[in-house]
Amino acid sequence: MENVYISSYSSNEQTSMAVAATDIRELLSQYVDDANLEDLIEWAMEKSSKYYIKNIGNTKSNIEETKFESKNNIGIEYSKDSRNKLSYRNKPSIATNLEYKTLCDMIKGTSGTEKEFLRYLLFGIKCIKKGVEYNIDKIKDVSYNDYFNVLDEKYNTPCPNCKSRNTTPMMIQTRAADEPPLVRHACRDCKQHFKPPKFRAFRNLNVTTQSIHENKEITEILPDNNPSPPESPEPASPIDDGLIRATFDRNDEPPEDDE
């Protein structure tokens, strides 16, 4: 393993030192067993270099801080830039305690990928202490194929071009809640996409016997033999009922009173 360069703060000046891999192992051996030591260091080195996040000042108005409870604070805090669709680390705060004081002090005095490496180590140590898997790649996802095996080629929609069942449904566009989404099927063999099949009525309702004959397509519209609803009477005129009175202009002569 390569040397890890750490910069630590003192009361007077900032000093920098190179900490070899053996020193990191000696530090981690205080918290974890030797059996988990190599895997933890390798995982932290890989993830810290892969998921390194930039540091910026929280001066923009469009940045929302993600709040963590103190019990869930593992030393990694993020803020979201809603305008640029990026994530940044902002104002890192580490709950220092006596158990991880040495490692927390090293995190406070570092920056860049070295800081990320130590933060991942702190996260992995806490997970090992609690008996939880820290590497998300080793966590097995729940398989729902027995319940929702929608990608089985046996039941897939066949491609109209090459008749292959190696197809995948895709939602192209989502619409309002009262409208169906735009769905297309893509064929992995011929690289063509096609519209999904539509449902058609395949049963014929016999009005006389009230029996359903399956697998017979409806070819004509059934007559509506139900009695028609009663005709509603015309509404009375509001003028006839005296609801609306005749109006006169102010220049007109007032109407004469009936004697």
From Swiss-Prot:
Reactions it catalyzes: RNA(n) + a ribonucleoside 5'-triphosphate = RNA(n+1) + diphosphate
Zinc fingers (TFIIS-type) by residue: 155-195
Class of this enzyme: transferase
Pfam family, one: Zn_ribbon_TFIIS
Family annotation (InterPro entries): RNA_pol_30_chordopoxvir-type, RNA_pol_30_chordopoxvir-type_N, Znf_TFIIS
UniProt-annotated location(s): Virion; Host cytoplasm
SMART domains: ZnF_C2C2 (SM00440)
Binding site for Zn(2+): C159, C162, C187, C190
Bias type Pro residues, positions: 226-236
Keywords linked to the UniProt accession: DNA-directed RNA polymerase, Early protein, Host cytoplasm, Metal-binding, Nucleotidyltransferase, Transcription, Transferase, Virion, Zinc, Zinc-finger
GO BP, one annotated term: DNA-templated transcription
SUPFAM superfamilies listed in its UniProt record: Zinc beta-ribbon (SSF57783)
Induction, as annotated: Expressed in the early phase of the viral replicative cycle.
Sequence similarity: Belongs to the poxviridae DNA-directed RNA polymerase 30 kDa subunit family.
Quaternary structure and partners: The DNA-dependent RNA polymerase (vRNAP) consists of eight subunits encoded by early viral genes and termed according to their apparent molecular masses Rpo147, Rpo132, Rpo35, Rpo30, Rpo22, Rpo19, Rpo18, and Rpo7. The same holoenzyme, with the addition of the transcription-specificity factor RAP94, is used for early gene expression.
Role noted for this protein: Part of the DNA-dependent RNA polymerase which catalyzes the transcription of viral DNA into RNA using the four ribonucleoside triphosphates as substrates. Responsible for the transcription of early, intermediate and late genes. DNA-dependent RNA polymerase associates with the early transcription factor (ETF), itself composed of OPG118 and OPG134, thereby allowing the early genes transcription. Late transcription, and probably also intermediate transcription, require newly synthesized RNA polymerase.
Name the UniProt record assigns to this protein: DNA-directed RNA polymerase 30 kDa polypeptide
Gene this chain is encoded by: OPG066
